[in-house]
């Protein structure tokens, strides 16, 4: 098994693709999901996954949804996993910047798209997300127009890039509206 892993790692470093991956009729993507419920319509991740699968289906892509744990990420390198399983690319949902595989994406040659995260300086890795500044400012403006002057902010985990961005957007919008930010009312959570 150790030799097999070494061969796969070497193949990845050399840019190898299987013959099956090169065929146009065999188009396979994976959606890695972490820290998010997605199996029923009321779950936050349900619509994200459904939209991705529907869009991929229109262009004849097969999509596998793969729940990921920290142990799963430690068991195998991202590039090796992708090559071994014949995936042409991946979509990452619910990951944070301290995840093992996100760190490996800094050097990957296998296309990846991140939802609400960002890896700089790798042309093979893109991201999509929300406009935190506009969204949070619209919410603050709405509350301000309703007469609220003491506004709380419940954020995601403190180690998340997107949470830091949203926190800054909250501070900026509060300042724009001449409102005081009360630190005890602007807190981080962990989505549980």
Q: Which residues does each PLM region occupy?
A:
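N-terminal helix-turn-helix DNA-binding module of bacterial transcription factors
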Residues: 1-25
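Short beta-strand segments enriched in small/hydrophobic residues
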Residues: 22-40, 142, 150-156
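Hinge/beta->alpha junction and helix N-cap segments in small-molecule ligand-binding domains
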Residues: 34-47, 65-74, 128-138, 154-175, ...
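Short, well-structured alpha-helical segments in soluble
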Residues: 73-87
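Non-catalytic positions within long, well-ordered alpha-helices that form the structural scaffold/packing
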Residues: 82-83, 106, 144-147
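Periplasmic-binding protein-like
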Residues: 86-94, 152-154, 186-187
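Flexible loop/hinge segments that line or gate small-molecule binding clefts
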Residues: 93-135, 180
